Design a protein with these regions (language model features):
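Short, well-structured N-terminal submotif of metal-dependent ribonuclease cores
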Residues: 1-39, 47-65, 139
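Histidine- and aromatic-rich ligand-binding microenvironments
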Residues: 5, 36, 98-100, 121
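Alpha-helix capping/helix-boundary segments
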Residues: 8, 39, 81, 106, ...
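Nucleotide phosphate-binding site architecture
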Residues: 9-10, 41-44, 126, 134
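Acidic, PIN/NYN-like endoribonuclease modules and their adjacent C-terminal/linker elements
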Residues: 107, 111-139
Length: 139
C-alpha cells in the first residue's frame, strides 16, 4: 500500500493540480492508495485556519470529496506506529537531523505497516531507514 503524504493530498485539492501528480495517481490502483490520520489532522487544521469565505468553502468541498474517496482507506496511528515514531525521532535527533512530529508519525505509520510513502519532500524522510519513498511530482 502507498500512503499519500499531506503535500500529495493537498495537491489533489488545488484548482490546477500538477499533471505529473495526476498521471502518477492514475497508475496506482485505488485499493493501493491511502491516507493516514496525521494527514487528516493537518488538512483539517489548515482549512480551519483559513479565513471564512469562498476559497475556504471550495477547499472544504474538495476535502470532503477526498475524505469520501479514502473513507475506508485511512490508516490509523496505533501502538506499533507510536513505537516506530519514537525510534525515528531518536535516530533523527541523534543524527543531528531532527524532524517534525507529524513527519515522524507519518513515517512511523508507514514503517510499522510496511507501506510506501508518496511525498514531494523526499529529503525530509531520507534519513528514515526502512522507509520506501516515492516522489509523484517527478516524471
Amino acid at each position: 500500500m502507498i500512503i499519500a503524504d499531506t503535500n500529495v493530498v493537498s495537491e489533489f485539492m488545488r484548482d490546477d493540480p500538477d499533471p505529473v501528480v495526476i498521471a502518477w495517481a492514475r497508475t496506482v490502483a485505488p485499493a493501493d492508495l491511502s491516507i493516514c490520520v496525521v494527514t487528516v489532522e493537518e488538512i483539517e487544521r489548515g482549512l480551519g485556519l483559513l479565513p471564512a469565505g469562498r476559497r475556504r468553502g471550495e477547499l472544504e468541498g474538495r476535502w470532503r470529496d477526498l475524505v469520501d474517496t479514502f473513507a475506508d482507506a485511512v490508516v490509523v496511528y496505533d501502538l506499533p506506529a507510536a513505537q516506530e515514531t519514537a525510534a525515528i525521532l531518536v535516530a533523527a535527533q541523534t543524527a543531528g537531523r531532527p524532524m517534525s512530529l507529524a513527519d515522524a508519525q507519518i513515517a512511523g505509520i508507514c514503517r510499522s505497516g510496511g507501506h510506501e510513502l508518496a511525498t514531494r519532500n523526499i529529503d525530509d524522510f531520507a534519513t528514515v531507514s526502512g522507509l520506501a519513498l516515492i516522489n509523484p511530482f517527478q516524471e
